[in-house]
Curated annotation (Swiss-Prot):
Gene label: nhaA
Lineage: Bacteria, Pseudomonadati, Pseudomonadota, Gammaproteobacteria, Enterobacterales
GO molecular function, one term: sodium:proton antiporter activity
Gene3D superfamilies xref list: Na+/H+ antiporter like domain (1.20.1530.10)
Entry's transmembrane regions: 14-34, 59-79, 95-115, 125-145, 154-174, 180-200, 219-239, 254-274, 292-312, 328-348, 357-377
Native source organism of the sequence: Enterobacter sp. (strain 638)
Chief location: membrane
Name of this chain's protein: Na(+)/H(+) antiporter NhaA
Length: 391
């Protein structure tokens, strides 16, 4: 029991479980004996009905849209804490991840287009390498445990949130034609209600969660990625301590083990099972996957590092407290883990075309993400060698 307690108390444990879950998914998705069971689990229909409201999704979408909204709620709480009283609590430090995220979206997209500019069909996938999978990036970072400065973790979180927001805007503008104005109006009303609760210092977390469920449902029905609702809820829950009680910090403490040891491993298991059927060396070396690999593995760190360097030189932003520029560059490599959001964009970009394009895109995403994960982890391990953060 002591050994088990020590394992779950170790900051790296969540990352280890996530990697095991992802590896298990790859095995299950590619073994003939388990392939059918794996896909049957993901396609299991789950229906929720309350009066006239009906949400009917398969297991994969419930994990990605509902459980991951809880993960994004935790991320929102942590980023808010650092913006208000932590490593991003100045305008210049808060601007740093914003500028980094812009570079991390623009340069990978341009690099992808450099590979595929002559192919009008492949060009439609330009946004694929612009995305960062925050869950997997944080999971790999967690493998380094207490050596990671809190400010570096928060920088990655903030950058990835902005990256995700950018991806959601790109999807809405370029890959979605049926947004629901009614649902977006309900979502706007729910956000206004959350703002009023915060302004009037309502400190009962349950009320925020109740309004948050309305927000999540409206965002889901609108056609926009529903996980965005989690970040918004987290930003409105009061952080300020009164009578020794902070609603935001208390909720953060409650959510952390559930997210690390249940939600993220489930997410990894549900999304990492990429079938390698039909994959060939000639397919891997074609312009489409090569553009994605280059965008994720080279474009991401290059864009983040270049824009951060310019921001520092022009004094538009400053480094997060307790971090170095070399650590930021290493995190930039880790941001090349595109994975689930990149796969989602690829299915939208090529859904009405040759299905083989999606297979090639997934192959490029998987290869680029694995390279980014391995090299990013290795670089950070070197850059953080000997560092242990105080508890």
């Amino acid at each position: 029991m002591k050994l088990l307690h020590r394992f779950f108390s170790n900051e790296a444990s969540g990352g280890i479980i996530l990697i095991i879950a992802a590896a298990a998914a790859m095995v299950f998705a590619n073994l003939g004996a388990t392939q059918g069971l794996y896909h049957a689990f993901l396609e299991t229909p789950v229906e929720l009905r309350v009066g006239v409201l009906e949400i009917n999704k398969n297991m994969l979408l419930w994990i990605n849209d509902a459980l991951m909204a809880v993960f994004f709620l935790l991320v929102g709480l942590e980023v808010k804490r650092e913006l208000v009283q932590g490593s991003l609590a100045s305008r210049q430090r808060a601007a740093f991840p914003v500028i980094a995220a812009i570079g991390g979206m623009v340069v990978p997209a341009l690099l992808y287009l450099a590979f595929n500019y002559q192919d009008p069909i492949a060009r439609q996938g330009w946004a694929i390498p612009a995305a960062t999978d925050i869950a997997f990036a944080l999971g790999v970072l967690a493998l380094l445990g207490s050596r990671v400065p809190v400010a570096l973790k928060i920088f990655l979180m903030a950058l990835a949130i902005i990256d995700d927001l950018g991806a959601i805007v790109i999807i809405a503008l370029f890959y979605t034609s049926d947004l629901s104005i009614l649902s977006l109006s309900v979502a706007a009303g729910a956000i206004a209600a959350l703002a009023l609760l915060n302004i009037f210092n309502v400190r009962r977390t349950g009320i925020y969660i109740l309004v948050g469920v309305v927000l999540w449902t409206a965002v889901l029905k609108s056609g926009v990625h529903a996980t965005l609702a989690g970040v918004i809820i987290g930003f409105f829950i009061p952080l300020k301590e009164q009578d020794g009680h902070s609603p935001a910090q208390q909720l953060e403490h409650v959510l952390h083990p559930w997210v690390a040891f249940m939600i993220l491993p489930l997410f990894a298991f549900a999304n990492a099972g990429v079938s390698l059927q039909g994959v060939t060396l000639s397919g891997l070396t074609s312009m489409l996957p090569m553009g994605i690999i280059a965008g994720l593995f080279i474009g991401k760190p290059l864009g983040i590092s270049l824009f951060c360097w310019l921001a520092l030189k022009l004094k538009l932003a400053s480094l997060p407290q307790g971090t170095t520029f070399r650590q930021i560059m290493a995190v930039g490599v880790l941001c090349g883990i595109g994975f689930t959001m990149s796969i989602f964009i690829s299915t939208l970009a090529f859904a009405s075309m040759d299905p083989q394009l999606i297979v090639w895109a997934k192959l490029g995403i998987l290869t680029g993400s694995l390279l980014a994960a391995f090299v990013g982890y290795s670089l950070l391990k070197v850059k953080l060698s000997g560092q242990v953060q105080p508890v």
